[in-house]
Amino acid sequence: MFSTFVPFLIMFREGLEAALIVSLIASYLKRTQRGQWMGAVWVGVVVAAVLCLAIGIFINETTGEFPQKQQELFEGIIAVVAVCILTYMVFWMRKVSKSVKVHLEGAIDNALNSGRGQGWALVAMVFFAVAREGLESVFFLLAAFQQDVGIGAPIGAILGLVCAILVGMAIYWGGVKLHLAKFFKWTSLFILFVAAGLAAGAIRAFHEAGLWNHFQDIAFDLTDVLSTHSLLGTFLEGMFGYQEAPTVSEVSVYFIYLIPALILFFLPPRSTAGSAIAAARKINP
C-alpha cells in the first residue's frame, strides 16, 4: 500500500502537468479559431508518450541482465538522476508557474506562424513539452521499481496517470476547479523528502557496488523502536526510504540534500525576467 502511494503521487503530479499543458494548448487553439491543428497536438502527445514508455522499458529490461554489482551501480546512478530531475521539477514549477500560460501561447503562435512546416513545428513543440514531463517520470519510476520489486509501485503509477488524465479532462471541460498553486506547493514539499530518501538510497547502492566504502558505521539503530517491519516503519520506508539502522554516510547525504533544499524552497520566489526565459525554453526548446 505504502509503496504504491509515492509512484501514484509522482505520476499524478507529472501527468497533471502534461495534461494541463495539453489542455492549455487545446483551449488556446479553440479560442483563436485554430481547432484544425488539434490533430498535430495529439500526434506530439502520442509520440512523446510512446518514446518515454519505450525508453523506460528498454532501460529496465537491459539492466536486468547486468551482474549484481553492475546492477547496484546502475541503481545508484538512476537514483541520482531521479533526485536531480525531481529537484529541478520542484524548483522549475515554483519559479515559472505563473508565467507558463503566457509563454505557452507565445510558443504556439511562433509554431503556427513558422511557414510551410507549421504543423510539424506544433508537433515538435507539444512533443518536447510532454516528453520532458514523461522522462522525469521514467527516471523516478525506474528508481522506485528498483527499490520495490512488488506490484504496488506499477499499480500506483498507472492509477496516478489515469487520475491525472481524468482530472485534466475535467479541468478542460470546466467540471473541476483545482487550486493548482497549493497543489503544486505541497506536493513539491513532499517530493523533496522523497528525493532526500532517494539520495540516501543512492549512497547505499554505491556502497553495495563497491564504489563507496567511507563512513559505513551505523549512525543509530532504531530496530527496537521503529522497525521497518512495523506499520509505521513500513509506511516511512515506502514513502521516504526510511532505514531502521542507516549508516553515517546515508544520514549525512540525506540531510546534506534536504536542509539546503528546504531553505531554498521556503525562500520567497524572485519575480524576474529569468523566469519567463526559463519557461519559454522548457515549452519551446
Swiss-Prot record:
<feature type="topological domain" description="Periplasmic">
    <location>
        <begin position="143"/>
        <end position="150"/>
    </location>
</feature>
<feature type="topological domain" description="Periplasmic">
    <location>
        <begin position="1"/>
        <end position="4"/>
    </location>
</feature>
<feature type="topological domain" description="Cytoplasmic">
    <location>
        <begin position="26"/>
        <end position="38"/>
    </location>
</feature>
<dbReference type="InterPro" id="IPR005217">
    <property type="entry name" value="EfeU/FTR1-like"/>
</dbReference>
<feature type="topological domain" description="Cytoplasmic">
    <location>
        <begin position="269"/>
        <end position="285"/>
    </location>
</feature>
<feature type="transmembrane region" description="Helical">
    <location>
        <begin position="73"/>
        <end position="93"/>
    </location>
</feature>
<feature type="transmembrane region" description="Helical">
    <location>
        <begin position="39"/>
        <end position="59"/>
    </location>
</feature>
<keyword id="KW-1133">Transmembrane helix</keyword>
<feature type="transmembrane region" description="Helical">
    <location>
        <begin position="248"/>
        <end position="268"/>
    </location>
</feature>
<feature type="topological domain" description="Cytoplasmic">
    <location>
        <begin position="94"/>
        <end position="121"/>
    </location>
</feature>
<feature type="topological domain" description="Periplasmic">
    <location>
        <begin position="60"/>
        <end position="72"/>
    </location>
</feature>
<keyword id="KW-0812">Transmembrane</keyword>
<keyword id="KW-0813">Transport</keyword>
<dbReference type="GO" id="GO:0033573">
    <property type="term" value="C:high-affinity iron permease complex"/>
</dbReference>
<comment type="function">
    <text>Uptake of Fe(2+) ions across the membrane.</text>
</comment>
<dbReference type="Pfam" id="PF03239">
    <property type="entry name" value="FTR1"/>
</dbReference>
<keyword id="KW-0406">Ion transport</keyword>
<feature type="transmembrane region" description="Helical">
    <location>
        <begin position="151"/>
        <end position="171"/>
    </location>
</feature>
<keyword id="KW-0410">Iron transport</keyword>
<feature type="transmembrane region" description="Helical">
    <location>
        <begin position="183"/>
        <end position="203"/>
    </location>
</feature>
<keyword id="KW-0997">Cell inner membrane</keyword>
<feature type="transmembrane region" description="Helical">
    <location>
        <begin position="5"/>
        <end position="25"/>
    </location>
</feature>
<feature type="transmembrane region" description="Helical">
    <location>
        <begin position="122"/>
        <end position="142"/>
    </location>
</feature>
<keyword id="KW-1003">Cell membrane</keyword>
<dbReference type="GO" id="GO:0015093">
    <property type="term" value="F:ferrous iron transmembrane transporter activity"/>
</dbReference>
<keyword id="KW-0472">Membrane</keyword>
<protein>
    <recommendedName>
        <fullName>Ferrous iron permease EfeU</fullName>
    </recommendedName>
</protein>
<comment type="similarity">
    <text>Belongs to the oxidase-dependent Fe transporter (OFeT) (TC 9.A.10.1) family.</text>
</comment>
<dbReference type="InterPro" id="IPR004923">
    <property type="entry name" value="FTR1/Fip1/EfeU"/>
</dbReference>
<keyword id="KW-0408">Iron</keyword>
<feature type="topological domain" description="Cytoplasmic">
    <location>
        <begin position="172"/>
        <end position="182"/>
    </location>
</feature>
<feature type="topological domain" description="Periplasmic">
    <location>
        <begin position="204"/>
        <end position="247"/>
    </location>
</feature>
<comment type="subunit">
    <text>Part of a ferrous iron transporter composed of EfeU, EfeO and EfeB.</text>
</comment>
